[in-house]
Amino acid sequence: MSEGVGTFRMVPEEEQELRAQLEQLTTKDHGPVFGPCSQLPRHTLQKAKDELNEREETREEAVRELQEMVQAQAASGEELAVAVAERVQEKDSGFFLRFIRARKFNVGRAYELLRGYVNFRLQYPELFDSLSPEAVRCTIEAGYPGVLSSRDKYGRVVMLFNIENWQSQEITFDEILQAYCFILEKLLENEETQINGFCIIENFKGFTMQQAASLRTSDLRKMVDMLQDSFPARFKAIHFIHQPWYFTTTYNVVKPFLKSKLLERVFVHGDDLSGFYQEIDENILPSDFGGTLPKYDGKAVAEQLFGPQAQAENTAF
């Protein structure tokens, strides 16, 4: 288990103070997006307790229970249960804790999420057979997707997608999903991200009818499957901005695949960003997403994820 997890007990008065803090947080009250979490902020520990039912005294017991459930289910011989056991046999307790947190310490539901995690990889092997830093680096450098280097005021990791310059002939939809999968795996190593979750901003300014026509239903379904029950991630909000009128046609293809919980977290703003700015501060957003920072730089983010790129290294697909 990560050493960053808190080991102190809080009395009710302290808990009330921390709950009050949670209502007034800014982006500066959270840890870094990239790299491990050295120590969870006290208010984040309180959030885990309140929202995820996490308790120090039951954390290890829950992990052990999930590990035992994996083995017990595999003993039945059911194909997916066996695949789950094989996939996790060398994983540490921190890996299991991600799934338990994502399902609010309900071990049975955490196991179902683990099944979904493995099944997604079996169902779409094309996303994982060549998944490596070298395979996805140039896609991430191009900004598909982007990741802000600062968390939002809720402590969430903010992922970006700007569709205007996307050419499917140059970067395929599967290559974009590969990059999403790699980033999710990487950033979920951070415990603060496990607890606070993700927010996704999709800028559809410049979305053309040709792009809309090129999006296959099977690709859109694959994207939705990635967001639902396939990662130990809390997707807290998906914001669409600057979408044209014909975006509705694409969205109507996706909506039947969305479960009610995720559908309630989708916000379609158009060009009126007043409600959007109530949730996402302008001062953490790049200018191409309506913020005050310089234009998004995918190469800088790739260096945060992978380190500097050697000149001789070939990261093309």
Curated annotation (Swiss-Prot):
Query: PROSITE patterns of this UniProt entry?
Result: CRAL_TRIO (PS50191)
Give me the residues that bind 11-cis-retinal, please.
180, 202
Q: Which residues form the CRAL-TRIO domain?
A: 136-297
Note whether Glycoprotein occurs among the keywords. Answer: no
Secreted among keywords: no
| Clinical condition linked | Bothnia retinal dystrophy: A type of retinitis punctata albescens. Affected individuals show night blindness from early childhood with features consistent with retinitis punctata albescens and macular degeneration.
Give the protein name, as stated in the record. Retinaldehyde-binding protein 1
Which species is this record about? Homo sapiens (Human)
Q: Report the gene name.
A: RLBP1
